[in-house]
Every structure is written in C-alpha cells, then in structure tokens.
Amino acid sequence: MRSANEPDATHVAVLLAETIVALRPALHTGAAVRCVDATGGRGGHSAALLAELGAADTLLILDRDPSAIAALRARFAQDSRVYIRQARFSQLAEVLAALEWERVDAILADLGVSSPQLDEAARGFSFLRDGPLDMRMDPGADRSAAEWLATATEADMTRVLREYGEERFARPIARAILRAREQAPITRTLQLAELIAQVLPRHETGQHPATRSFQGIRIFINRELEELEAFLPQAMNALRAGGRLAVISFHSLEDRLVKRFFRADDYRISADVPLRASELPPLPWHPAGKALRAGPRETRDNPRSRSAVLRVAERSERHAA
C-alpha cells in the first residue's frame, strides 16, 4: 500500500508548493485546524496538506469519482485525521453540516481532470485513446456524452461547443455530427475525434483538432461551470475569519468565474454612489496575492500544468462571524 507521503505515479499534483505556501497562513493558527480538499483526485494535494498539518488537525477530502474515492481511501487508510466523502464540491455545505463543522480554516479545489481520468480509455475523456464516449466524472450520473450526442439538436451542439469549448467552428462540427449519426451512432472517442478533424481547416495547428470540442462536451456533461458557481460561495461562507480558499483552474471559462468571484464584484458599490472610502462597507473577502502560473521547470516536467492558474482569496474578519 502506498503511504500518504508517497506520490501517485499516474498523477502529478499541479502548483503543489505554491498552493501550500498560499494556504500556510491559514494552517498555523495555534488551534486545531480543519481543512478541505474539495477535489481529492489521487491525493497529491491532500498528502501535502497533511504533511503541513499537526496531529490534532483534520482534513476532509471530497471527490465525485468513485474510482478516486477508492484510491483515496487506500492511500490514507492509516491516517485518522482524514475524512473522505464521495460528493460533488457543490455539496460542500451539505457535507460540512453532516459533520457538524461550522467553520474551516482552508479549502482547496483543483478543477482539472485528473491524469487517470484522461489516460484510462474506458472513461471516455481522451481524444487520443479509443474508448466509449462517456466523459462522466461520476459514471453513475445522468447521461453520457454519447447519449447526449445521439439526440442533441444542431443548435444545442453549436451552443455547447461555442460557449464551453470556445470552438470557432462549432456550427460546422455540429452539422457534421448530425450527418454522421444518421449513418451510425457516435459511441467512441476516436470516432468523434476523427470526425472533428475532418471538419477543421488543415491550417489549424498547435493542438489536436478535437481539443476544444471535447472540452466543451465534457464541461457540459458534468455541469462543471454550474458546479463551480455553486461551490465558490459555499466555500467562502464556510471559512473562518482569515481562512483561505485556493482554486486552481485550467481554462479561461473557469478562471474568469473565479477571478470575478474573488474580486467580490457583486458586493462592490458603484463609483457613482457619493460615499467616502471610509464609509464603504468592507468586502466579504479579498484576493490574497496575485494569480500564479506554473514555472518553466513544472511545465517541462508536467505539460498538463501549462494552462493552470492558482488564485487565492481570504475571508474578511467582519463577514465571517
């Protein structure tokens, strides 16, 4: 059995040192600390958090993927500080209530698809490996990508590919899918990837032609942006005064949501309101430092870290009572 300090060779935690450094001010308070890893994956960030925590501290680990839960339970079976729950991170408030945890000190969410999910063809996330066109992070949830593609309208497919995949050729791809499924069901990852490659212009280089489309379908199938929008306020409301939330995002749609939320734009008063700065109410939280990206060494050793962005926010004193 792998120990909690032993890394999982199939998955490398992104921005690991930077995340721990950013959360460290919330982890050493002189009292018993409670932390949450809202996206446990294979436990890389969790293990680093546990190495930072003391014997009286506790860590709650969440993941929606049952295979990740099994791996986490095996990895941390001998650590009594760890609580593991299979849940979406949008269920954070519900899980904390069940544990009777009123406040926590630090929360981490790594929004990326884990390497085991990408590398295991049977999960249906990869356009490089042939497998069933599934893409569900929780295989028992709702419909698969193949089931959606079998009935989606051209308008729906175009919207998903354009909004979630930021695909410029969304409509031609949607039309090609409609034509292809009239001949045979689209049920395999390489079947869809090859279809998309035939549609995109040959001069489109720099990444696999199916990258954006697969991203868009995956985000839609797993309701990833809706999950994130539900998670962020729950996480911030769960923090004690001075507690910190760290979020690692991997594409611009996620990062824009996180950036806007961390800036507390919904709580800001218009500059047209005639109030002095001293009269303005304090914001409920504020960004803690600048956004961080992986350095040259990490991007060389782990190419999947190239698009990662770490943002951290701290709960304000007057709003965490």
Curated annotation (Swiss-Prot):
Protein name, UniProt field: Ribosomal RNA small subunit methyltransferase H
**Out of the domains of life, which is the source?**
Bacteria
Name the EC number(s): 2.1.1.199
Q: Give the molecular function GO annotations.
A: rRNA (cytosine-N4-)-methyltransferase activity
- Name any Gene Ontology BP term: rRNA base methylation
**In UniProt terms, what function does this protein have?**
Specifically methylates the N4 position of cytidine in position 1402 (C1402) of 16S rRNA.
Q: State the similarity comment.
A: Belongs to the methyltransferase superfamily. RsmH family.
The reaction(s) annotated as catalysed by this protein in its Swiss-Prot or TrEMBL entry are:
cytidine(1402) in 16S rRNA + S-adenosyl-L-methionine = N(4)-methylcytidine(1402) in 16S rRNA + S-adenosyl-L-homocysteine + H(+)
Q: Where in the cell is it found?
A: Cytoplasm
List the InterPro entries hit by this protein, alphabetically. Answer: RsmH (IPR002903), SAM-dep_MeTrfase_MraW_recog (IPR023397), SAM-dependent_MTases_sf (IPR029063)
- Organism of derivation: Acidithiobacillus ferrooxidans (strain ATCC 23270 / DSM 14882 / CIP 104768 / NCIMB 8455)
Keywords on record: Cytoplasm, Methyltransferase, rRNA processing, S-adenosyl-L-methionine, Transferase
One GO term of the cellular component aspect? cytoplasm
Q: Where is the composition biased (Basic and acidic residues)?
A: 295-304, 312-321
Known NCBIfam families for this protein? 16S rRNA (cytosine(1402)-N(4))-methyltransferase RsmH (TIGR00006)
Residue segments, region Disordered: 286-321
Q: What is its main location?
A: cytoplasm
What residues does S-adenosyl-L-methionine bind to? 43-45, 63, 89, 110, 117
Q: What start-end ranges are recorded for coiled-coil regions in this protein?
A: none
